[in-house]
Amino acid sequence: MSKSKCSVGLMSSVVAPAKEPNAVGPKEVELILVKEQNGVQLTSSTLTNPRQSPVEAQDRETWGKKIDFLLSVIGFAVDLANVWRFPYLCYKNGGGAFLVPYLLFMVIAGMPLFYMELALGQFNREGAAGVWKICPILKGVGFTVILISLYVGFFYNVIIAWALHYLFSSFTTELPWIHCNNSWNSPNCSDAHPGDSSGDSSGLNDTFGTTPAAEYFERGVLHLHQSHGIDDLGPPRWQLTACLVLVIVLLYFSLWKGVKTSGKVVWITATMPYVVLTALLLRGVTLPGAIDGIRAYLSVDFYRLCEASVWIDAATQVCFSLGVGFGVLIAFSSYNKFTNNCYRDAIVTTSINSLTSFSSGFVVFSFLGYMAQKHSVPIGDVAKDGPGLIFIIYPEAIATLPLSSAWAVVFFIMLLTLGIDSAMGGMESVITGLIDEFQLLHRHRELFTLFIVLATFLLSLFCVTNGGIYVFTLLDHFAAGTSILFGVLIEAIGVAWFYGVGQFSDDIQQMTGQRPSLYWRLCWKLVSPCFLLFVVVVSIVTFRPPHYGAYIFPDWANALGWVIATSSMAMVPIYAAYKFCSLPGSFREKLAYAIAPEKDRELVDRGEVRQFTLRHWLKV
């Protein structure tokens, strides 16, 4: 913000507002004192009132209560992957030893990136695209994360529909996945648990038969046996379609009025999982074999830390478990009050996220230990990753308990609430990001929200066909893998290097009254970008084509997957080229306008571009 100039008259002092007279909100005032001594006018000036963010003048909706924001962030970050993936990775990678790289990466990269996104959204008061007025040429990364969130919505809502289907099926005296005497069961169905199943198998293709729970999921719910592959999808299943419709209706009426409605919904969806997890833990630890399961979960093998795969798994889990890079944290924090303490919010929410992930392992492995003892197999034979854990192994364990139907209802209500608030966050990222960018959409938020949820519903129909699990697997593998890591990397570089850690720290001090310490500035400037670059490179080097059980995807499906992945990443260079070409002036002038914040426009006009100085790039 530049100081306004005023002519000096013969009066002893002149007060000149630094903003237009009609500007709303706190103003920066330049007080110019003029004295006359021996016929010479002497002037001195001071600034009253600190600089305020220009966005504070905007009439923007805010959260009804601070707790609404915290519950929304926690509800989004704590999702289904925290329940099934973290405990499995911990068991797979040396038990308690896995916590060493996980906590290390959480402290040096996860928390700083989380804090950065909260501060970025809160200061600029806009969605994932609008915040890039701090560096216009990188605005494409905002559209990248918006597109990724949209892609994720195409298949994530299907998981919630599965949970809803299971919930309805649980309101019976006898759960439908207990026996092999149902219409969907095959001759291979066996009540005995297959002890030699492969690590990636869901249970359907085992040599000696499959469990009733596995057949219920793949034959009773998905009807996968009626499809030969991704090129043989078949029609949408009406039961799953009906469940998907209910999910879309829930999402729409949770989002249509903005954070005023979604902030109330999360009081249920974000707290219910903790109530259910506590109940399941109390029940799980009383089961025979539960202690063996928990012991396997916590067993420490520090020699595993010598393996690169353990560190890679920890790094990727940190990136995905916190939810950075989806634009959700930016969108949520943009509705905060300008002076909100986003630093404290970042510490609290990331800590709760990590503790929830760790605690859920006790719930999961108490039941896995019970299942392993019941079927006399090693825990490794029942410990699975992915949907198979929560839709096959866990329902099978619950079916053997007294009052199994009641426990099943409780469990799938938990899955439903875990999924709903995470899906709400993804949709809010898309909606806020676009309505802040296009004022026409802002004036018709309700209609635009309806359009977005209907679009996700129509494309989700491919995932509820007979072969829908193949579409689901393809989207899950490509939509938010390397592309989301790439988006976060560009975001971190844009904030820390182009905009500058110094300026970003000034913004935070302006909001909270406290400047980030050297630790956070070093993480933003050096550690986090290097960490993200490492994870991106590793994700590319270790890439493996997707598969579902024994099914291998054809080449055209893998090519389609890469089109999906690159379409979001391409937003960065495409928008950068568009922005650069649309700016006037010479090459140097174009570059100056492209990388300098919009609020520094007057400085650019005068040729004072701090991004062209070595001091800017070296400053921490």
From Swiss-Prot:
Outcome recorded upon mutating N353A: Reduces dopamine uptake. Reduces glycosylation and cell surface expression
Extracellular domain ranges by topology: 172-236, 288-306, 377-400, 543-553
InterPro entries associated with the record: Na/ntran_symport (IPR000175), Na/ntran_symport_dopamine (IPR002436), SNS_sf (IPR037272)
Entry's localization field: Cell membrane; Cell projection, Neuron projection; Cell projection, Axon
Positions annotated to bind chloride: Q317, S321, S357
Chain segments annotated as coiled-coil in the UniProt record: none
Keyword Hydrolase annotated: no
Residue sites binding Na(+) 2 per the record: A77, D79, N82, S321, N353
Entry GO CC: axon; axon terminus; cell surface; cytoplasm; dopaminergic synapse; flotillin complex; membrane; membrane raft
UniProt KW keywords: Cell membrane, Cell projection, Disease variant, Disulfide bond, Dystonia, Glycoprotein, Membrane, Metal-binding, Neurodegeneration, Neurotransmitter transport, Parkinsonism, Sodium, Symport, Transmembrane, Transmembrane helix, Transport
Glycosylation sites: N181, N188, N205
Transmembrane segments: 57-95, 96-127, 128-171, 237-256, 257-287, 307-335, 336-376, 401-442, 443-466, 467-499, 517-542, 554-583
Consequence when changing P395L: In PKDYS1; loss of dopamine:sodium symporter activity
Membrane topology: Multi-pass membrane protein
Family indicated by similarity: Belongs to the sodium:neurotransmitter symporter (SNF) (TC 2.A.22) family. SLC6A3 subfamily.
Quaternary structure and partners: Monomer. Homooligomer; disulfide-linked. Interacts with PRKCABP and TGFB1I1. Interacts (via N-terminus) with SYNGR3 (via N-terminus). Interacts with SLC18A2. Interacts with TOR1A (ATP-bound); TOR1A regulates SLC6A3 subcellular location. Interacts with alpha-synuclein/SNCA. Interacts with SEPTIN4.
UniProt function note: Mediates sodium- and chloride-dependent transport of dopamine. Also mediates sodium- and chloride-dependent transport of norepinephrine (also known as noradrenaline). Regulator of light-dependent retinal hyaloid vessel regression, downstream of OPN5 signaling.
Protein name per UniProt: Sodium-dependent dopamine transporter
